[in-house]
């Protein structure tokens, strides 16, 4: 896909994967509408990129249905078209399902599942008017292989993956594509701030960079894939566990021990 003069909306666009994707889209010549709850970081990334392309910002909570509708009206008003929607905003509160606050559970469902469903639905007529376009949902390997201490998060990402696959079929032949990128742990700093609550199983997999996930987002815009897992080997492992669930009790302890070693090493490095 040629991004020159295309309009790209990125939720969660102020930092991490969202900011990395914004930089790559800007380098490719796309116009950007960046969305986040925090104005300070949003303004900072917008100012950084304005020498390269046109950038607008919209401060909002993606769980606000009225704001979601206003987002597309703003994009249409500012740029005259919408070509790509990246549903990247996310929320993750780790802990045992019995102890995680009900408000946090609800917010994970609202932000990680309900919001991208609503935003995708709202985007469709605008993408159709532009002659076609792309929706990229940022999922997680936890949506393919549920992770302890992240039960609700895993459920929200699994639901997002299922929605993506179903809508992909509904949109077949329409000129509008939807896909999901499913990364494992990402080196954005957030994972280290809550490391004691992160499952050992999570750290058994290679940690991706925000740039690697962002590049996968751009790649999915221009190919026929419905899903891209990062790292690829982790995606293969989750597929095997899904196809052969009887394997899980045998291999899981190995990966948990491996992850525990990695976690201890990371914590030691953080103390230095």
Where are each of the predicted segments found?
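Conserved glycine-rich Rossmann-like NAD(P)H-binding loop of the short-chain dehydrogenase/reductase
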Residues: 28-45
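Active-site helix of classical SDR
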Residues: 120, 156
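Substrate-binding pocket helix/loop in short-chain dehydrogenase/reductase
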Residues: 96-97, 101-109
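Conserved glycine-rich cofactor-binding loop
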Residues: 7, 14-16
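SDR active-site lid
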Residues: 170-232
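Residue(s) in the substrate-gating loop at a strand-loop-helix junction
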Residues: 140
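The beta1-alpha1 cofactor-binding region of Rossmann-like NAD(H)/NADP(H)-dependent oxidoreductases
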Residues: 40, 58-70, 102
């Amino acid at each position: 896909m040629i991004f020159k003069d295309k309009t790209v909306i990125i939720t969660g666009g102020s930092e991490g994967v969202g900011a990395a994707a914004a930089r790559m889209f800007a380098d490719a010549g796309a116009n950007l509408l960046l969305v986040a709850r925090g104005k300070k970081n949003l303004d900072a990334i917008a100012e950084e990129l304005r020498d390269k392309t046109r950038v607008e910002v919209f401060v909002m909570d993606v769980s606000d249905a009225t704001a979601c509708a206003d987002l597309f009206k703003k994009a249409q008003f500012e740029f005259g078209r919408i070509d790509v929607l990246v549903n990247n905003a996310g929320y993750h509160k780790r802990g045992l399902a019995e102890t995680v606050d009900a408000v946090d559970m609800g917010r994970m469902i609202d932000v990680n599942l309900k919001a991208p469903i609503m935003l995708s639905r709202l985007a469709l007529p605008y993408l159709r008017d532009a002659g076609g376009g792309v929706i990229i949902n940022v999922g997680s390997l936890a949506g393919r292989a549920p992770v302890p201490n992240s039960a609700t998060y895993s459920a929200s990402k699994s639901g997002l993956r299922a929605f993506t696959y179903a809508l992909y079929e509904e949109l077949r032949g329409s000129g509008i594509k939807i896909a999901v990128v499913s990364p494992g742990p990402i080196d954005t700093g957030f994972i280290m701030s809550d490391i004691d609550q992160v499952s050992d199983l999570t750290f058994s997999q290679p940690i991706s960079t925000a740039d690697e996930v962002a590049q996968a987002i751009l790649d999915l815009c221009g190919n026929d894939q419905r899903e891209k897992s990062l790292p690829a080997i982790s995606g293969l492992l989750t597929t095997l566990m899904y196809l052969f669930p009887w394997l899980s009790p045998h291999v899981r302890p190995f990966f948990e021990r491996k992850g525990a070693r990695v976690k201890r090493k990371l914590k030691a490095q953080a103390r230095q």
